[in-house]
Swiss-Prot record:
The active site is at S66, E164. Disulfide bonds join C73-C119. Substrate binds at K230, T231, G232. Pfam families: Beta-lactamase2 (PF13354). This is Beta-lactamase SHV-24. SUPFAM superfamilies: beta-lactamase/transpeptidase-like. The class A beta-lactamase family has a specific amino-acid numbering system, sometimes called Ambler or ABL numbering and often misspelt as Amber. A multiple sequence alignment was used to derive a consensus sequence and then the consensus was numbered taking into account insertions and deletions. This allows use of identical numbers, e.g. for active site residues, despite differences in protein length. UniProt always uses natural numbering of residues, hence there appear to be differences in numbering between this entry and some papers. One of its GO terms (molecular function) is beta-lactamase activity. It comes from Escherichia coli. Belongs to the class-A beta-lactamase family. It catalyses: a beta-lactam + H2O = a substituted beta-amino acid.
Length: 286
C-alpha cells in the first residue's frame, strides 16, 4: 500500500512540470507579449468552416509588411482568371525600378521576368521589386485595396509601395490589417470561387515553396505536417506570418500571427512566433 501511495505521489509531482512545459496557446501569447514588451495579434481559423478556434487581439490593426504579397498575387491570379492577365507575360524593367532586397529580380535586368516568375519571387523570396512590378499591374496600392473591398474585406488596406510600407508607425492605419481580416481573406482566396481551382492551387504552391520562413513555424513543425506560409518584417519590431497548417500533409487551419511595437531583435521575434506556433500545434495534437 505504501508503494502505491509513493507511486501516486511521484506521478502527481510530474503533472505541474508537464503543464508548464507546454503552455496553452493563449498563455504562450501572453507570455510572448510580456517577453517582447510589445503587442501580439493572432488567429487560428478552421479552413473548411471558417470557425475561429483561437484568437488574441484578432480585431486590432497590425502592419501587413510582406504578408500583403500573398493577397497581391491573389489579385494577379484573379486578373488571370478574368482573361486580363497572363502568367506567361514578360515584364521588362530598369535598374531604377529596383528597391532594397530584390534577390531574384536584380538578376534579370537584361531579360525581364514573367508575371508568374514575379509572383514566385515575391512570395518565395519576398522580393520587393517583384512586388512593386506586380502592384503596378493591379493599379498600385489603391488598386489592391479596391480588390480587397470587392472580395468583402473592408478592413485591410495598402497605401504605399515597397519598401516604405514597412515603416510600422504607432497608430498609423496605412498598410495594416487585422489577424481576423487577413485570415478571412486568405480563406476566400483559397476556398471560395473568387479564384479558379487552378489559381488556388498555384497560390498555395507558391506559399508551400516559401524559402525565407525557416526560423518561424517551420522550425517547430512535426514530421509529416503540411505548411504553406508567407512572412513579413518591418520597422519598430514589426514581424508577421500567415500560414496554412495541418497534420498528414493536409492544409486544415489558417494561422495568422503579427507582432508590433517591440524592441526585440529579429531573432527574438522569430523565436516568439515559433513558440506560439509550437503551442498551437501541441494543443492541436491533444
Amino acid at each position: 500500500m505504501r508503494y502505491i501511495r509513493l507511486c501516486i505521489i511521484s506521478l502527481l509531482a510530474t503533472l505541474p512540470l508537464a503543464v508548464h512545459a507546454s503552455p496553452q496557446p493563449l498563455e504562450q501569447i501572453k507570455l510572448s507579449e510580456s517577453q517582447l514588451s510589445g503587442r501580439v495579434g493572432m488567429i487560428e481559423m478552421d479552413l473548411a468552416s471558417g470557425r475561429t478556434l483561437t484568437a488574441w487581439r484578432a480585431d486590432e490593426r497590425f502592419p501587413m509588411m510582406s504578408t500583403f504579397k500573398v493577397v497581391l498575387c491573389g489579385a494577379v491570379l484573379a486578373r488571370v482568371d478574368a482573361g486580363d492577365e497572363q502568367l506567361e507575360r514578360k515584364i521588362h524593367y530598369r535598374q531604377q525600378d529596383l528597391v532594397d532586397y530584390s534577390p531574384v529580380s536584380e538578376k534579370h535586368l537584361a531579360d525581364g521576368m514573367t508575371v508568374g516568375e514575379l509572383c514566385a519571387a515575391a512570395i518565395t523570396m519576398s522580393d520587393n521589386s517583384a512586388a512593386n512590378l506586380l502592384l503596378a499591374t493591379v493599379g498600385g496600392p489603391a488598386g489592391l485595396t479596391a480588390f480587397l473591398r470587392q472580395i468583402g474585406d473592408n478592413v485591410t488596406r495598402l497605401d504605399r509601395w515597397e519598401t516604405e510600407l514597412n515603416e510600422a508607425l504607432p497608430g498609423d492605419a496605412r498598410g495594416t490589417t487585422t489577424p481576423a481580416s487577413m485570415a478571412a481573406t486568405l480563406r476566400k482566396l483559397l476556398t471560395s470561387q473568387r479564384l479558379s481551382a487552378r489559381s488556388q492551387r498555384q497560390l498555395l504552391q507558391w506559399m508551400v515553396d516559401d524559402r525565407v520562413a525557416g526560423p518561424l513555424i517551420r522550425s517547430v513543425l512535426p514530421a509529416g505536417w503540411f505548411i504553406a506560409d508567407k512572412t513579413g518584417a518591418g520597422e519598430r519590431g514589426a514581424r508577421g506570418i500567415v500560414a496554412l497548417l495541418g497534420p498528414n500533409n493536409k492544409a486544415e487551419r489558417i494561422v495568422v500571427i503579427y507582432l508590433r511595437d517591440t524592441p526585440a531583435s529579429m531573432a527574438e521575434r522569430n523565436q516568439q512566433i515559433a513558440g506560439i506556433g509550437a503551442a498551437l500545434i501541441e494543443h492541436w495534437q491533444r
